[in-house]
Curated annotation (Swiss-Prot):
Species name: Trypanosoma cruzi (strain CL Brener)
InterPro entries, per database record: Ecotin_sf, Prot_inh_ecotin
Pfam families to which the protein is assigned, alphabetical: Ecotin
GO molecular function terms attached to this record: serine-type endopeptidase inhibitor activity
Family: Belongs to the protease inhibitor I11 (ecotin) family.
Gene3D superfamilies: Ecotin
Protein name: Ecotin-like protein 2
Amino acid sequence: MSTAPKTLADYQAPYPEATPNQKRYVIFLEEKDYDSELEEYKLQLIPGRVMKVDPVNRCFIAGSVKEKTIPGWGYNYYVVEMGPMATTLMAVSPGSPPVRKFVPMAERPFIPYNSKLPVVVYMPKEGELHYRVWTPTKPKEEIAGER
């Protein structure tokens, strides 16, 4: 396996600069064999913010993740727009102090795993990007039976 480039500049692609209200995240994925990348691996983007919230309710942030393409290159990048936070309405014990924690967006898209290109994501400045790499623990194919 070859050593993957470690900077966005190594790709010589004209990815846009982040606007003054954005920050740009770049993820370099570990190289896998071609068929595995296509069939087994997926990358999940988990945008969100670190916020003070009560310790009981489940919270999430409204918003969207839009896929865009560099014209003439075919390289994709993602732009995150974040909206307000929503929460469940369970009662909180009196005196429970708020806690700082990462609150994810409701939309957490799965995108193809491709180690040949960087994953470039533009987020609002107050946002934070987490991600997960998904793969089957044990490749197993079965045929469903009739009952």
